[in-house]
């Protein structure tokens, strides 16, 4: 029934290979493996973690929807994917985007199309290059993920300068801005940085501004904003 046992054909990043399955201290099973980008090299990969469950016949299957989406890290035994769902929606999908500049062939829409294999690129890596996403309405934002794309990067191998420095701000009107995330002094390499906010913010606009980019041009394959909107649930 579940063949292959772990399978992810779609989503922001897909594929699941070279995996291993293990059990945590609470008795939950997990499958870890590599998801593929493979634009610059066939082994351009990311490591993804998926919860494993058992159907009524006792057959195991990996639930792969949470591999590129926020999930609750359990502190007890869980029995279904719903136990790990934080009830946040992807608010930034195909929303309007404004940028400081755009390199030909790498449009801003690529940063909100849920495809890690396409990206927006600014024309430079200068301090001050920015991208703003209009969520369309004031929303309650709980988490943000920034996936950098390294357009025209020339660094080879592991060096100490491969970190990203930036600021994220939020606004309800696009005029008055508040600091949401300050990574202007960051020295940790995190090309797929995920930030869960200490407390949610209410905003319509989210802006990321470059401070330092290690090589190439300031570029983003996914500026992903997670949260809720004040709307009734579908009937």
Give the predicted meaning of each segment.
Residues 1-20, 62-82, 185-187:
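Surface loop/turn signatures of beta-propeller and other carbohydrate-active proteins
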Residues 131-142, 197-202:
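Extracellular and analogous surface-interaction loops
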Residues 22, 28-37:
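Hydrophobic core segments of beta-strands in well-ordered, beta-rich domains
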Residues 39-89:
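Beta-propeller fold recognition
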Residues 125-127, 153-230:
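Trp- and acidic/polar-enriched beta-sheet ligand-binding modules for extracellular glycan
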Residues 72-137, 147-161, 188, 224-235:
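Disordered, acidic Ser/Thr/Pro-rich linker "stalks" and the adjacent N-terminal cap
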Residues 11-12, 39-43, 155-160:
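Short consensus segments that form the blades of beta-propeller domains
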Residues 52, 135, 144, 168, ...:
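Extracellular beta-strand elements of beta-rich domains used
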